């Protein structure tokens, strides 16, 4: 049984994972299955030497804001589909990131085979929260 505690998050109530073993299981699953580390940076700083490569090959580039960086992980736990926000940073004094279970409606196949988005939570001018996706790391278990 997964130990969670309800907390306020982005103007909603979500379930915060409390047990370090549950968190470590998810962190290990991402790393051992897909070599994805929670705290690895996923951006590069542009240098002049990169421009010839960009000019000669099709690329999609996004700007990153100062939002809070999270993974949105669609997976199953005990055969139950679950959507998890995994904080991309570990707060001082902690060994693991915050992991939150949220209620989103995605196709079941995305959960069964693991899907992972990278993005930022951004608060709008009217105090609403948006998750802006800037990367797709896994699509149904396949590295993208």
Where is each model-derived feature located?
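Catalytic nucleotidyltransferase
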Residues: 2-4, 107-144
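Active-site-proximal "nucleotidyltransferase
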Residues: 1-113, 118
């Amino acid at each position: 049984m997964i130990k969670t505690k309800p907390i306020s998050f982005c103007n909603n109530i979500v379930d915060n994972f409390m047990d370090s073993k549950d968190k470590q299981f998810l962190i290990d699953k991402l790393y051992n299955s897909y070599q994805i580390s929670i705290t690895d940076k996923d951006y590069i700083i542009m240098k002049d030497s990169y421009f010839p490569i960009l000019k000669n090959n099709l690329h999609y580039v996004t700007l990153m804001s100062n939002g809070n960086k999270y993974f949105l992980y669609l997976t199953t736990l005990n055969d139950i589909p679950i959507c998890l926000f995994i904080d991309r940073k570990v707060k001082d004094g902690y060994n693991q990131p915050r992991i939150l279970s949220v209620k989103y409606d995605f196709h079941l196949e995305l959960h069964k085979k693991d899907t992972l988005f990278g993005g930022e939570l951004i608060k709008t001018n009217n105090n609403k929260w948006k998750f802006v996706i800037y990367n797709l790391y896994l699509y149904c278990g396949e590295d993208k």
